[in-house]
């Protein structure tokens, strides 16, 4: 029984490692700077959506990594502290970029949500109309 858990952990670690290796290779060949971790997330998401990888194959290690995510951000926090001098020089520019990006992100997210919700409401209305038409056909009321 414990052998299966170890194998499951090792197979999940291998899947994550392979995805990160591929994303690192892709990141080095891209003409624009893109974090390999973001590329890895896109690859993992794509593989899950295409059902190349089943959720069960990566779920327990993903849950474990999510549980220690605060610990994984410690090196990033230390890097930010080491860069405080540079950040102080460009404080206004950095703050402006953060505020503008946040406003744009909120606007795009809101518009996208309205688009999706509006699409769902339209489909619901179309489905109701179709049911009424089909019900009328059953009773011989629609020509």
Curated annotation (Swiss-Prot):
It is found in: Cell membrane. One of its GO terms (biological process) is programmed cell death. It is a multi-pass membrane protein. The chain crosses the membrane at residues 7-26, 31-53, 58-80, 90-112. Inhibits the expression or activity of extracellular murein hydrolases by interacting, possibly with LrgB, with the holin-like protein CidA. The LrgAB and CidA proteins may affect the proton motive force of the membrane. May be involved in programmed cell death (PCD), possibly triggering PCD in response to antibiotics and environmental stresses. NCBIfam families: PRK04125.1. This is Antiholin-like protein LrgA. It comes from Bacillus anthracis. The gene is lrgA.
């Amino acid at each position: 029984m414990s052998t299966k858990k170890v194998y499951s952990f090792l197979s999940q670690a291998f899947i994550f490692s392979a995805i990160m290796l591929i994303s690192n290779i892709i990141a080095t060949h891209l003409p624009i700077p893109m974090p390999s971790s973001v590329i890895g997330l896109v690859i993992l998401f794509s593989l899950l959506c295409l059902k190349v990888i089943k959720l069960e194959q990566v779920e327990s290690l993903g849950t474990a990594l999510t549980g220690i995510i605060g610990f994984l951000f410690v090196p990033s926090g230390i890097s930010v502290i080491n860069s405080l001098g540079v950040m102080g020089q460009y404080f206004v520019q950095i703050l402006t970029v953060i505020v503008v990006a946040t406003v744009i992100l909120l606007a795009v997210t809101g518009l996208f949500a309205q688009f999706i919700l509006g699409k769902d409401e339209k489909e619901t209305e179309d489905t109701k109309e179709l049911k009424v038409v089909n019900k009328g056909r059953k009773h011989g009321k629609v020509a």
